[in-house]
């Protein structure tokens, strides 16, 4: 939903309506939106009209419940790392109140997946909890702009701005900026891999945030099934047409 909210519903509809017949078929929808097709097609005629599309986007929504944190963890939520008011450019920070050492702790930074077109930082809490619960690590989970709002390289610019922000605030929050691991799955895996190999690439650094004096190098990368070779990704058997103009990779 956050991916779509940055655009006017009519603009989204027009972009998805590839044959310009004023209706959306399942094949015209992005992969992540197809699961909602039957919910949007209220008259069950096998296509989505502009009125149905707008009504669905304007429907009342229940706020998502945040996973509860274990006792002994201090959470700092929705911290802006890019000096903007965009919720997609925020991170959550998790600090153990009882630490296993007096020295600054290493930090694990989680980057969510979702095909670069959906996903949210809150999905990282369950994965990070065992580490900061034990008092051995500080944890962070970041949002980044999705492809429906900004195209590449905005995503890596955001991730690097988040890393710089964390380094600039390491002393304040008591973690070791030189022992920073990044962990992600799928699209998040791609982004952490990019962080690992592009620490010295100025073209991918971006100019976001107030911590331009910091670099975006990391000391450890944990890439869970992140795509790496986009030119050949469509050559392997798959239910997804990776070379389609509507694919996340495109």
Task: Go through the PLM ranges and name each one.
Residues 1-4:
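Hydrophobic h-region of N-terminal signal peptides that target proteins for export
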Residues 29, 34, 53, 112-114:
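Solvent-exposed coil/turn segments that connect beta secondary-structure elements
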Residues 19-29, 42-54:
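Acidic Ca2+-chelating loop motifs
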Residues 8-19, 34-44:
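Primarily EF-hand calcium-binding motifs
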Residues 7-8, 31, 70-71:
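Short loop/turn motifs at secondary-structure junctions and domain boundaries
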Residues 16, 40-41, 59-250:
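Alpha/beta-hydrolase superfamily serine-hydrolase fold, recognizing
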């Amino acid at each position: 939903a956050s991916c779509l909210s940055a655009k006017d519903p009519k603009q989204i509809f027009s972009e998805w309506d590839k044959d310009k017949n004023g209706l959306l078929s399942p094949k015209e929808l992005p992969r992540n939106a197809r699961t909602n097709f039957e919910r949007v097609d209220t008259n069950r005629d096998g296509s989505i009209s502009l009125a149905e599309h707008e009504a669905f986007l304007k429907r009342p929504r229940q706020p998502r419940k945040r996973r509860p944190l274990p006792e002994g963890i201090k959470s700092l939520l929705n911290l802006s790392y890019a000096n903007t008011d965009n919720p997609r450019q925020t991170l959550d920070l998790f600090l153990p109140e009882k630490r296993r050492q007096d020295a600054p702790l290493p930090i694990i930074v989680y980057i969510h997946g979702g095909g670069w077109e959906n996903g949210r930082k809150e999905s990282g809490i369950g994965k990070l909890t065992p580490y900061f619960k034990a008092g051995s690590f500080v944890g962070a989970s970041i949002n980044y702009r999705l492809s429906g709002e900004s195209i590449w390289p905005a995503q890596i610019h955001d991730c690097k701005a988040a890393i710089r922000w964390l380094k600039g605030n390491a002393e304040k929050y008591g973690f070791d900026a030189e022992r920073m691991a990044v962990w992600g799955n799928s699209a998040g895996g791609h982004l952490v891999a990019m962080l690992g190999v592009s620490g010295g690439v100025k073209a991918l650094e971006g100019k976001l945030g107030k911590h331009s004096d910091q670099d975006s190098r990391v000391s450890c990368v944990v890439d869970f099934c992140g795509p790496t070779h986009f030119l050949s990704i469509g050559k392997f058997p798959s239910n997804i047409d990776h070379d389609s103009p509507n694919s996340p990779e495109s």
